């Protein structure tokens, strides 16, 4: 299936009034995770634009350290995903504690970059946009269009770059399983 770039959402939808933001329920991790995944899929192009702007500014100020940081993060992420698909312990950790998995990737990247220097470039250039994405995705309430777009992604009617990344992190498998179970129950 072809990979489609999600459309750029209107900025007044991306940053609406405060009535469309709410603190997540920290006691219900699965609901919070669902909100984050849904918003990451729906606003992925907006997140990419914001991250590209921030990374460009930091990269302009310190290009070598920014490139080094990007290479290290990509290599560490790829290594952890490969290891998680080949080792049961990492696979379980990635599935049960996705936030911890991402934090381990970030900490490992931080450690490797600190060996080469340029730690602050890494923190502000790469990690800060990721942190902003996570905060926005956690706080932004979903709307009906968001839910519809996510269902299309979940059942495989469309593929997006963020969907591929979330699949690598095994964040969409559970939803697809739940959806197929729901359909089979409806048939009975």
UniProtKB/Swiss-Prot annotation:
Positions of transmembrane segments: 36-56, 57-77, 94-114, 115-135
Localization, UniProt: Endoplasmic reticulum membrane; Cell membrane; Cytoplasm; Cytoplasm, Cytoskeleton
Domain of life, source organism: Eukaryota
Presence of keyword Transmembrane: yes
Matches recorded under Pfam families: PRA1 (PF03208)
One of the GO biological process terms: positive regulation of apoptotic process
Keyword entries, A-Z: Acetylation, Cell membrane, Cytoplasm, Cytoskeleton, Endoplasmic reticulum, Membrane, Transmembrane, Transmembrane helix
Residues in compartment: Cytoplasmic: 1-35, 78-93, 136-188
List of residues that carry N-acetylmethionine: 1
Keyword Cell membrane in annotation: yes
Function: Regulates intracellular concentrations of taurine and glutamate. Negatively modulates SLC1A1/EAAC1 glutamate transport activity by decreasing its affinity for glutamate in a PKC activity-dependent manner. Plays a role in the retention of SLC1A1/EAAC1 in the endoplasmic reticulum.
Quaternary structure and partners: Homodimer. Heterodimer with ARL6IP1. Forms multimers. Interacts with ARL6. Interacts with prenylated RAB1A and RAB3A. Interacts with SLC1A1/EAAC1. Interacts with RTN2 (via first transmembrane domain). Does not interact with VAMP1, VAMP2 or VAMP3.
Protein name: PRA1 family protein 3
UniProt lineage: Eukaryota, Metazoa, Chordata, Craniata, Vertebrata
The gene coding this protein: ARL6IP5
